[in-house]
Every structure is written in C-alpha cells, then in structure tokens.
Curated annotation (Swiss-Prot):
A Pfam family it matches: HSP70
Sequence ranges of Acidic residues compositional bias: 622-631
Residue list for modification Phosphothreonine: T197
Chain segments annotated as transmembrane: none
Record-stated family: Belongs to the heat shock protein 70 family.
InterPro entries the UniProt entry points to: ATPase_NBD, Chaperone_DnaK, Heat_shock_70_CS, HSP70_C_sf, HSP70_peptide-bd_sf, Hsp_70_fam
Gene: dnaK
UniProt function note: Acts as a chaperone.
Region (Disordered): 598-631
Name of this chain's protein: Chaperone protein DnaK
Taxonomic lineage from the root: Bacteria, Pseudomonadati, Campylobacterota, Epsilonproteobacteria, Nautiliales
Induction behaviour: By stress conditions e.g. heat shock.
Amino acid sequence: MSKVLGIDLGTTNSCMAIYEGKEAKVIPNKEGKNTTPSVVAFTDKGEVLVGDPAKRQMITNPKRTIYSVKRIMGMMCNEEKAQEAKKRLPYNIVDRNGACAVDVDGKVYTPQEISAKILMKLKEDAEAYLGQEITEAVITVPAYFNDAQRKATKEAGQIAGLNVLRIINEPTAAALAYGLDKKEAEKIVVYDLGGGTFDVTILETGDNVVEVLATGGDAFLGGDDFDNRIIDWLVDEFKKETGIDLKSDIMALQRLKEAAENAKKELSSAMETEINLPFITADQSGPKHLVKKLTRAKFESLIEDLVEKTITIANNVLKDSGLSKDEVNEVVLVGGSTRIPLVQQKVKEFFGKEPNKSVNPDEVVAVGAAIQGAVIKGDVKDVLLLDVTPLSLGIETLGGVMTKIIEKGTTIPVKKSQIFSTAEDNQPAVTIHVLQGEREMAKDNKSLGQFTLEGIPPAPRGVPQIEVTFDIDANGILTVSAKDKATGKEQKITVTGTSGLSEEEIQRMIQDAEAHKEEDRKRKELVETRNQADALAYQTEKSLKEVGNAISADERAQIEAALNDLKNVLKDENATKEQIEAKVQALTQVSHKLAEAMYKKEQGQTGGTEQGGTEQKKSGGDDDVIDAEVE
C-alpha cells in the first residue's frame, strides 16, 4: 500500500514524514537532513536548484533565487503586504492577472509553481528513501491562511504530481503529533512561530479526539521579520559610519540577510555575536568592511514589539476559547523561531507556566501531517480531528456591508445557507461577492471572488428569494452556490478568487513540471556519463604508465588516439551523452589488451601468496572475498 507523505511546506524550511509501523517518522532528504530550505534557484545555464544547493548561491545569484515565496502565496499584488514583500525580497515580484508572481529572466512563475518545485524535491527524495512511488500527500498551512492561500497550496501539490488528500492547519497537526497518545483530556495551546507566519491555536485533546477551540494568528509575522530588524539596524549603523546606504545594493543585502539569520540563531545560546562582512561595498577611498557586535539585549530590543504582538494575538485567542490561563494544561512551542529566549520568556510570563519543549519544533508539524494521512487511509483508527475556520465568511450586501454566513471558529466541514433578495425592482441578476474577514464593511475584508446568478424573473425589490449556501470542506476550502427559489436556477463556484488558477492553467503547469523533471533526469544522466568517462580516461592513462610497454606500439597508438578523442569530447561543454558514450565505447574496445596486461601484472603481484590462498580456499575462509575481487 502506498504511503501518504506528510509535508510541512514552510516559509524558510520544509519537512516531510510518513506513518509506518504504528508511528510517524521524519524522512531525511537526499542530503541527509531532516529539513530542506524552501529555496528555488535558476542558474544562468537554465538548471533548477532546490533546497541547500539553491540556498548556497543566494548571495551570488540574488535575482534568480526565490525564497519565502509562501509570503506571497494566494496574494493579490495590490495588497499592502505584497507591496512590503516587493520592497524586501531581491527577486522580481510582478502582477499576473492581479495576483503576485515571480519574474525570472522574463519567464513568469506563480508562487504555486515555485512551491511545486520544493514539493517535487521532497516527493523524489522520499521515493528514493522509501524505494516506492509516492502519489498522495497531506500538506500543512498556517491556521490563519485564508481561502485563496489554502487553495494555492493545494494547487502547488497538484502541479508537483501529488494528490493532496487534505490541507491541515499547522498547529492542529502539531497537536495531533503531541496529543495522540494522551488518554487524559488536556487543553493545550500550540504557539507556532515559524519563518514567515505566526499562529496560536487552543485545542482539547484526549481519548483520540483533537478538537480546536479557537485559533488566530498573523500570516506575515515570523523569523523573516526578526532578520529584517537586524538588517535594518546594520544598514543604519553602516550608513552612520560611512555615509553609504546598502539598501540599493542587492548583493550586499543578501550577505546581510545571511549574516542576520546566523546572528539570530547564535544569540539563542550566546549572549553576544560578531557580524563580520569584509568587502561589503566600496567607494572612492577603497573597499569597506562591516564589523559589528550584536548583543542578545540589543537583538531583543529590536524585536520586542513583534514578540509582544504574538502575545496580544494569544490573549485574543484565549478569550475566544472561553478558557482562563489556569485551565490551560500545556503550552507547546512549534516553529524554529520559538528557540529565541525572549519568545520563550514572554510565553512563560503570559501563560504563567514553563512552555513544553518536548517536541522538535522543526519536525512536529510534518509528523502530525503524516498521522493525519494515516487517519484518512484508515491506518490509524478512531481518531477524530475537529478543526475550525479561522476567519468569518460572508457576502457583500446593500450599502457595502459584509454579511457573515459562517462565523470564525465554526467547526469544519460545515454547510450554511441564508436567504437574500434583490435591491431593485425587476432586477434580472444578482452578483454574489464572497468575502473573508472580521470587518463590518466589505471593502475592509479579503475578497475571495464573485459570480453572477442570472435569469431572475421580473419582480418588485425584496420579493425574489435567493438562497446563498456556503460549504467548507475538511481542507477549509470554500464552495459557494446561489439559487433562485422560484425558478430553481442555480449558480455554483468553488471560490478561486482572482489569485487562483484555472483548471487549464494547473494542467499546463503539471505538464511543465513533468517536462522539467525529464530535463533534470537527462542532465543528471549526462553528469554521470561524464564522471564515468573521466574515471575511464584517468584509469587508462594510469595503466599506460604502468604496463604500456607490455603491448605493441601499434596497440598503444590506437589507445592513445582513442584516449585523446575522449579527453577532447569531455572538454566540450556542449557534448551530448551519446557523443561521450561513443568515445567511451571506442576507447574500451581498443584497450582490452591493456586491461589484460594490467590483470596479469596484478596476478603476478599476488602470486607470492598463491599457496596460502589455496590453503584458505580449502578451509573455505576467503572463497567469497576472492570472487568479489575478480568481479
């Protein structure tokens, strides 16, 4: 039976796990690490790098290295947060039909396509590790992701060739991993502060039930923002000292980004760190170096307001849950940014208890996703997961008001209907504008899309009865329908919003991804062929030096000619796999006499111990070893 891959698709890093033998376990990538940087890079030769290889060349290739793409997933370009991301990120964010996309050398990629490349790497590495094909996945998203962001995540999975069985909230996944084996009922807070997003969710676990009581968060608050505070401080300090503004130097900013991230990590255990960036820039007087000491106290002063913001959100969620702090049994920390001492201190002060650090903050979400996959498949029995919608959903009504149909905190899946009518006499059609958010006015909420129900018979305003139904599935993805009760006419859409992709676009992107997969396979085969050819050339040269005198001059000349042909084809960067293989075959054919001479030489060297070898063979001691050497 095929395994379901549990995937934590993170802003900074991603992680994967499977459920096997009654437990979920994290799968390492092909580099042997349990987490993979969520970074995709395009080289000037058209090669696509994902993970650590992509991250390694962020500084030298900033315009073609895409990271933190989760921050613009399912987002419209005119949104304030998108404009903020544009200023911060070194690559080119462009408008694609109103939605955010990335331009690399004139080719436009949606955030879904970039994320799909990360998912494809995880899928391929898992397949190599497990020795079987993976076709199904459960992918996690921040609890505070809106409908457009959830749908975009599911589309990324489809493009990567995965059947996404479920989109699950990250804190809920963490609670599932933490609380599955707890028999006693516990009320737990999952405080999830990752690279780009923050969620706090309050759940009740026990006796195989995980029920979300309340959730809240900020989809634009995380470790990236802490890095940015350090970067801004370094830029200001450097400008004071030299008069040079590094903000316009993309390569310098990438070096600052890397240094800030490292400094942040070091300050989790050290009280002080030095940021040393030689040759950061230059002016007429010569090269400039950036050397600054950053203390933990200074770092904490830079990020304190951001950490306080998470506590304010936690307080609001606690109120929504109807619980007091005393009723909370455990506070579980999730996400790499919870390693920051100030974060742990503020959480402890607010909840009045030591946070639970028993789970690995980088891996627990993927583990929970794998458990959810096993629940869906029936490998884990009798587990009930009751999640909620993080934001209210409704439609725009007369006067630009947001009328809520499903309130935030409603357990999903859920289906609710409400009757509306026309605003004018003889109105032939109604436009249903679908919204998500908590504000009173439509314009202040997130627009998820709109559609029109036509063919309403002429009637005075207020007479027609239009039934609007909101249906949220277990993924938190919304379908909206409008039905004229008099005629039975119905219009239904799965809300994609203007940032969503059409089915045709998704299929095209799947085909593109497959085509690139084939290109990558061919590129890998070419590299392997080159390596084998290089090894053959080296071995042949070595053999010629050692036993070249044992063959005729004519044979030696043929071998040297074939060897030179192989060396020349290896020098040609544009040489194809077939061209290299032809030269390898030619050299192999003419050098069999040389191979025989080498074999005889080796046999001669071992001849002195032949008698002992015979004795060992009689006793059966080295029979297998000798056979292996001959092969």
